[in-house]
Amino acid sequence: MVECLTGKKILIKGNYAIANAAVLAGCQCYFGYPITPQSEIGEFMSGKMQELGRSYVSAESELAAINMTIGACATGAKAMSSSSSCAIALMQEALSYAASDELPVVLISVMRGGPGLGNIYSSQGDYFQTTKGGGNGDYKLIALAPSTVQECVDLTYKAFYLAHKYKNPTVLLADGLLGQMMEPVEFKPYPYPEIDNSEWALTGAKGRKSRIIRSYAPLADEQCVFLEKLFNKYKQIEENETEWEEIGTEDADIVLVSFGSTFRNIKTAAKICRQKGLKVGVFRPITLYPFPHKRLNELADRVKKFISVEVNMGQMINDIKLSVDGKVPVELIHKPVGAPPAPEDIAAQVEELA
């Protein structure tokens, strides 16, 4: 069991770092079901939450876990679940309900290979699942993608903050490699203000009017009004919370784009390309939703080509193409599953595509 420490730097595995950060963010309830490669999160929470007098439930299924999380969030609690890929697929109906109910669910998704049962190797194959939504109807999940174990901590903090700020389900999307990787991490105190939920949380109606949280709108006009309200909120999220990182794009002819742990390799690949005389920059969406469409469109006015580097068969490339809007070509370098392509291999393919 990893001790929960604030203000100290320790060598720690990604999954333990995420769980540690959730506790420090004030997570009051955790509901989970074990699945590789994220089982260490539940392992950590099983001891630490009870030690702190908080709630931990090892649920009978993934469906039960996410619906328990919804119930806890309806009371205004900071509640979280975690799972992986094929098990996250089982949660899609509940996530649609959580978005419709406007509840601050935090979900940790540590990706493994697919489709179907797939395998336990690292993957980035759940980009579509997270950013396009597997549940019914018009809704969005805020999605944050760390590239280091330190960012697993920092973005777990942010996931709790954004979920409660916007009353919207928020996913920390980490590839399995990050979940199992060990790196030095500093656990700083939770940096965000606490959000007042007293106006909506179901905390008992004594002394006030009764409240109802629901996703059912029996009349078409009522549903139209609700969806307009929901998408006005998404517009605010897109305007205020879009986050990315870019390096060497000011003079680049080619920009490599990736998310998660793959970003580490494209940074090295870009340096190799620069040494060979190719002007290559790198770009990383930190928020997968909201996606940095506007910034990529601006870059497309002066670069000659984008190359998406992914550990899947090509998913984020579709959003890059949408962002670029046909101004320049968009190519793909990928591996279907496992560790990201090696920097030398990426650089060699960039030379071929240049």
Model regions: which residues?
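Thiamine diphosphate
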Residues: 1-133, 140, 148, 336, ...
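Glycine-/acidic-rich phosphate or pyrophosphate-binding loops and their flanking alpha/beta elements
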Residues: 13-17, 231-254, 267, 271
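Short beta-strand segments
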Residues: 83, 106-110, 144-146, 171-175, ...
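Conserved thiamine diphosphate
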Residues: 122-175, 342
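Conformationally flexible catalytic loops at phosphate/diphosphate-handling active centers
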Residues: 167-246
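Generic long, charged, amphipathic alpha-helical segments
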Residues: 266-299
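Peripheral docking tails and interdomain loops at the edges
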Residues: 310-354
